[in-house]
């Protein structure tokens, strides 16, 4: 089992040069992540990039709610988006693109002036995931663990929501 191993990038791997990088599931190549055109699970590089883009957009949406009221749809969109990025849930690029668009539209409802602001503050921008992948090993591992944990919780929240149960 790889569950107790601290994740480390293979020597010489620069994530910014790879077509894809995914170490989300137990099928990960050589216990070091999938980095080619497709993962062991069948996820393509384009799908992996769209999942990262969706994650970035979701963080931007969450940041937009820090100082602004969310709408009645915000929680649903965040939960659906997180669920969509879980391992082997959705490898359909069009669905991922549509979800990214929904997240951006929701963010523009919450902070409509940010998309046309001339003095960009960055407070509601999509998050740059390079900040995670290029960071200190321990910080990267911790942030990854938190992200995967939140995605796992979103799976339960998504299924509860489908069954009609919600709770703030």
Language model feature labels by segment:
Residues 6-168:
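An N-terminal assembly and electron-transfer interface module characteristic of large anaerobic redox
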């Amino acid at each position: 089992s790889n569950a107790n191993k601290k994740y480390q990038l293979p020597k010489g791997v620069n994530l910014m040069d790879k077509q894809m990088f995914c170490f989300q599931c137990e099928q990960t190549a050589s216990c070091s992540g999938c980095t080619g055109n497709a993962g062991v699970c069948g996820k393509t590089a384009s799908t992996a990039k769209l999942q990262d883009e969706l994650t970035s957009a979701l963080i931007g949406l969450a940041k937009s709610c820090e100082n602004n009221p969310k709408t009645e749809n915000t929680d649903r969109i965040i939960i659906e988006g997180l669920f969509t990025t879980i391992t082997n849930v959705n490898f359909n690029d069009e669905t991922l693109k549509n979800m990214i668009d929904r997240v951006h539209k929701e963010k523009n409802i919450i902070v409509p002036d940010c998309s046309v602001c001339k003095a960009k503050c960055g407070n509601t921008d999509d998050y740059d995931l390079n900040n995670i992948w290029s960071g200190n090993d321990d910080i990267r591992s911790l942030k990854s663990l938190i992200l995967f944990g939140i995605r796992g919780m979103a799976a339960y929240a998504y299924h509860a929501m489908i069954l009609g149960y919600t709770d703030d």
